[in-house]
Amino acid sequence: MSFRARQTPGRRYLLLFAAILPPRRQELILSETTLATDRIGTDPIGRLLIDFSIPAIIGMLVNAVYNIVDRIYLGQGVDPLAIAGVGIVMPVMMIIQAVSMLVGIGANSLFSIRLGERRSDEVEKIMGHAFALLFLFPAVCITICMIFMEPILRDIMKVSDQIYPYANSYLRIILYGAIFAAMSPGLTHFIRSDGHPKTSMLVQIVGAVTNIILDPIFIFTFNLGVAGAAWATIISQFISFVFVISYFSSKWTRLRFRIKHMKLNAKLTGKILAIGFAPFIMQFAMSLVGVLQNAVILQYSGDEALTAMTIFFSVLTVIIMPLMGIGQGTQPIIGYNYGAKQYGRVKKCFKYSYLACTGVLSAGFIVTQFAPGFCFSLFSNDTGSLRELGMLTIRICTSAFPIIAMQMMGGQFFQAIGKPVQGAILSLSRQIIFFIPSLLFLPILFGVIGLPRIYGVYWAFPISDLLSATLSGIFIYREFSNWKKIKKKEKE
C-alpha cells in the first residue's frame, strides 16, 4: 500500500472536495508530491509541532466554542437554570466522548506507531476496526440511556424539579446524534496522522461554525429553547461526520474504510482498546466524578452553585482545549519517532509541548485570577449572588493551573508510546485517586473549621492538580532515565 503524499498548504483545504475535481488533475497533483508521513521522522521537531499542533489547537478551540455556545445562548437568552440543566447531563455525553477517545485515540496511536515501523499492511485494518467500534459502542450507550432516562436523571444525577425539564429535553435529543458525536472526532485523528492536520482542523471548524449558526435560529427564531440547542448540535455533528467520510472516499488519500476490515479481530481490537484505555478512563472518570461532584454540590448548596460550577467548566473548556490540541499534534510525532527508535526526537517533542502547555495555562491563570467577572459575564448577565459565587468558583478552581501541564502531557506521552498502564495511572491520579478523596473530605473539614462546606468542593481541584502533577513528573523522569540506560548499553 502507498500512502497519501504531502500537499502544499493551499491544496490541503481542497482535500474534502477532491471528488469534484477531474481525475487527471488529481493524478497530476498526487504525482508532484512526496510521502507526507516521511517528514515526521526527519523534519525539525519545532517545525513539526507548529505544523501539527497549530491546526489541532485551532480545531480544539473551535470545538470548545462548539461545546459552550449552547450555554452562552441559553444563559443569556433563556434562563440561567438552563445552563445547569445542560451541565448536569454532561456526564452522560462525556461517556460518549470517552468511547470516542477509547477507540479513536487508541487506534490512531497504533496507526502512527505502525507507520513509523513501516508496517503498512496493518494500517487500513486499524481504521476499519476503529469505524466498527465507533459505531458499536455508542449504540450500546444510547440504548441504555434511552431505556433508563428517568432513573439516570432522577436517581443517579439527583436532578431537581426546577432543572429536570431542561435536562430531559436536552439529553433526549442529543442522544439521537450520539453516534455521529463519537465517530466524527474519533475518525478525524486519522486525517491528522495521514499527514493533513489542516484538513483535520477544517472538519472541526465546519461542525462548529454550523452549530454557531444554527443555535440562535433553533433557540430563538424557532423558539425551541433547550431543545433547539440540542438539535443544532446533532445536525452539526452529522455534517462533520459527512466531511470525514468524504475525505477518505476521495482520491487525495490512498487510505480507505473497507468493509472487510470492519470484521472485528480480537487481537487487534484488544491492542486498540489497551492503548486507548488511558484517555478513555480519564474521560470516563471525569464523567463519574461529575455525577459525584454534582451530588455533593446539591448536598451542600443548591441549583445556584451547580450553575456556577457549570460556568466554571465552560471557562475550563476554553483553556484546556489548546492543551488537547497540542497533545493531538504531538501524538503522531511521538508515536512515529518512538516506533522508529528515535528517542532523542521523542524527548525533544515532549519538552517543547510541555513548555507550550505551561505557557497556555499560565495565560489562563492570569485571566481567571484577575478577570473572573469577565469570564462569568460571557454566560450570564446576573449581577447578584450567582455572579459572586461564580467568580469565587472560577478563582479557586483555577489556582493551580500553571502546574498541571505535566499531568496532562504525561498521560498523552505514555499513550503515544504505547504504554497504556502508565498512561491510565496518571489519568486516574487526577480524576479519581486524588480528586475523589479531596471532594469527599474537604467539605467536612471546612465545616469543622467554620467555613462554608461548598468551599471544600472548590479546593479539591487545585489540591488534586498539585498531587497528580508531582506523580506525573516522577513517571516521566523514570521513563527518560530508562532510555538513557538503554542507550548506554547499546554503546557498550
Which ranges hold each PLM region?
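Helix-terminus/linker motif at the lipid-water interface of multi-pass membrane proteins
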Residues: 61, 65-83, 153-161, 217-224, ...
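Residue-level signal for short hydrophobic patches within transmembrane helices
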Residues: 42, 46-65, 69, 92-99, ...
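Interfacial/gating helices of multi-pass transporter permease domains
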Residues: 74-94, 161-166, 226-229, 268-275, ...
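Transmembrane helical elements of multi-pass membrane transporters/channels
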Residues: 51-70, 173, 184, 207, ...
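Short runs within selected transmembrane alpha-helices of multi-pass transporters and secretion channels
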Residues: 104, 174-192, 200-208, 229-242, ...
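Small-residue-rich hydrophobic transmembrane alpha-helices
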Residues: 83-143, 181-200, 308-366, 370-372, ...
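Short alpha-helical transmembrane segments in multi-pass integral membrane proteins
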Residues: 3, 12-53, 111-177, 221-276, ...
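Helix-loop interface residues and adjacent transmembrane-helix termini in multi-pass membrane transporters
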Residues: 68, 77-80, 114-117, 193-194, ...
